Swiss-Prot record:
Taxonomic classification: Bacteria, Pseudomonadati, Thermodesulfobacteriota, Desulfuromonadia, Geobacterales
Metabolic or biological pathway: Lipid metabolism; malonyl-CoA biosynthesis; malonyl-CoA from acetyl-CoA: step 1/1
InterPro entries per UniProt: Acetyl_CoA_COase_a_su, ClpP/crotonase-like_dom_sf, COA_CT_C
Pfam families linked: ACCA
Protein name as annotated: Acetyl-coenzyme A carboxylase carboxyl transferase subunit alpha
Length: 319
């Protein structure tokens, strides 16, 4: 599908695409013009392929944040069936920035948890811009404990700029909620698959991202802090986000090389936002394949391998 919103670096291909559309409207039944349209369409695809195969880290950040990228609820509708949402943390309230519930993947029951952003202003406010409060993480943990009790695999979708930093969130124990999730997820005896679909922002992402397999979409990002936040701390200038993005090494390719993630899931030409259904098909295959492998691993081994997976990410370099 054609994207409604374009990024600055796409401008050359977008301008050509508009001209192709105009020519296609003029062509009508003219076979000669129709042939030219086909040639130009192929040229558009080639241009887009060149652009997206050479994205800088900062450009990748822009793609990861694209407002039309599929969110958790989109993947729930396209990959899973029989989704039943579960609400509340049984302590404070329900956090709309995290969606959680029961679903079926290829007929098999699973638990699905994910950050949820909004597309328009009203929905963005309702979802708190995808930034969970402590009750969101406690809700996620409550649902994960249900998965443990009923021996259901857990699949999480990560897409958040970070945990909500408001005063109320701190008063209700934001840090404790995140830390507890990390500890409890590390010990769960059911398979856990994590998919970073857009932004993987710091502890706010990690609180639902301790898994046996961590996948990243091709143009998603995952880092300890946003580029703008990093720039504000290092140089007291949030506008130096592009420079910070290069230093953070936050792309899927970077993190695969660093062995932080296990698999990069290819996106459709131009990004997941251009074809939700194609992206969902590719991701469905990757999740199903990884889940089949994990189901064959004994629970005790699963927990030990998960622990070792995250333990080896800490490395000291002596200079």
């Amino acid at each position: 599908m054609a994207a409604q919103y374009y990024m600055e670096f796409e401008k050359p291909v977008v301008e050509l695409e508009k001209k192709v559309q105009e020519l296609a409207e003029l062509a009508g039944t003219n076979a000669e013009l129709a042939g030219e349209v086909t040639k130009l369409e192929k040229k558009v695809d080639r241009m887009r392929e060149v652009i997206f195969s050479n994205l800088s880290r900062w450009q990748t950040v822009q793609v990861a944040r694209h407002i039309e990228r599929p969110f958790t609820l989109d993947y729930l509708n396209l990959i899973f069936t029989d989704f039943t949402e579960l609400h509340g943390d049984r302590l404070f309230g329900d956090d709309h920035a995290i969606v959680a519930g029961l679903a079926k993947l290829d007929g098999e029951p699973v638990v699905v948890i994910g950050h949820q952003k909004g597309r328009d202003t009203k929905e963005k406010v309702y979802r708190n811009f995808g930034m969970p409060n402590p009750e969101g993480y406690r809700k996620a943990l409550r649902i994960m404990e249900l998965a443990e009790r009923f021996r259901l695999p857990i699949i999480t979708f990560v897409d958040t700029p970070g945990a909500f930093p408001g005063i109320g969130a701190e008063e209700r124990g934001q840090a404790e909620a995140i830390a507890r999730n990390l500890r409890e997820m590390a010990a769960l005896t059911v398979p856990i698959i994590v998919v970073v679909t857009g932004e993987g922002g710091s502890g706010g992402a990690l609180a639902i991202a301790v898994g046996d397999r961590v996948l990243m979409l091709q143009y998603s990002i995952y880092a300890v802090i946003s580029p703008e936040g990093c720039a504000a701390i290092l140089w007291s200038d949030g506008t130096k986000g592009e420079q910070a993005a290069e230093a953070l090494k936050l792309t899927a390719k970077d993190l695969k090389e660093l062995e932080v993630i296990d698999e990069i899931v290819p996106e459709p030409l131009g990004g997941a936002h251009r074809d939700h259904e194609a992206m969902a098909r590719t991701l469905h295959e990757a999740i199903a394949r990884q889940l089949k492998e994990l189901k064959a691993i004994p629970a005790e081994q699963l927990v030990e391998e998960r622990y070792q997976k995250f333990r080896k990410m800490s490395r000291f370099i002596e200079g």
